Regions:
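Regulatory loop-to-helix N-cap segments in sensory/regulatory domains
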Residues: 1-5, 132-149
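GAF sensory/regulatory domain recognition
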Residues: 33, 45-69
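Sensory-domain boundary capping and coupling elements
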Residues: 119-133, 157
Length: 200
């Protein structure tokens, strides 16, 4: 019961933090920081797929060194496969798994285990959320399910932020096209269109 409570509290905290974000970059950063802190992991990273290069670009990270983050490109179709296959991938020993693209860099960084889950929006994989631990970790189904839920929330929040920014940009464009005078207050009231005798 204690662990269930911890998972619930963590999910609530992460959701509340993400809900206050205004852009996709902020969503990624808050997600990485919240997951790293909540799991007391070594680090957490959020990757987004570049459809042109077929690589996963780093969107945000917390707890990992710049040297490790700059280790090289992460191939969408090659490394680990959580994004490509749309399934979570739990690796107990990163030094003994052929799916790890940069094992030496992981060893130098002090990474023992890794959990990667896809970030999905509108049934399409847009990236991956990865949790790194310094000690060997047998990720339980509860761990995996929680990280999947957070990744899902992250994907939805990013999508909403993009829509909001696009909507805001469209309004600004319309204002510029029509002129600011058009949008000045015309003194409308809740009784607009109602006969004066009724409004009184």
């Amino acid at each position: 019961m204690e662990k269930h409570t911890m998972y619930y509290d963590m999910l609530v905290r992460v959701t509340n933090a993400i809900s206050q974000c205004n852009d996709p970059e902020e969503v990624a950063l808050v997600t990485a920081e919240s997951v790293k802190t909540g799991f007391r992991a070594k680090g957490c990273s959020v990757f987004l797929v570049d459809r042109d290069t077929r690589e996963m670009g780093l969107a945000a990270s917390h707890g990992l060194s710049r040297e490790y983050l700059d280790k090289g490109p992460v191939r969408y179709m090659q490394e680990i496969g959580e994004a490509q296959d749309q399934v979570p991938i739990a690796i107990y020993d990163v030094q003994d798994d052929p799916r790890i693209q940069y094992p030496e860099a992981a060893k130098k960084e002090g990474i023992s285990s890794l959990l990667g889950v896809p970030i999905i929006s509108h049934d399409k994989v847009i990236g991956a959320l990865r949790v790194y631990t310094s000690e060997p970790w047998e990720f339980s189904m509860q761990d995996i399910t929680l990280v999947q839920a957070i990744a899902q929330i992250c994907g939805m929040a990013m999508d909403m932020c993009r829509m909001y920014k696009g909507h805001k940009t469209s309004i600004e464009i319309l204002k510029n096209l029509r002129g600011k005078e058009y949008y000045k207050s015309r003194g409308w009231t809740p009784y607009e269109g109602v006969p004066i005798s009724v409004a009184r």
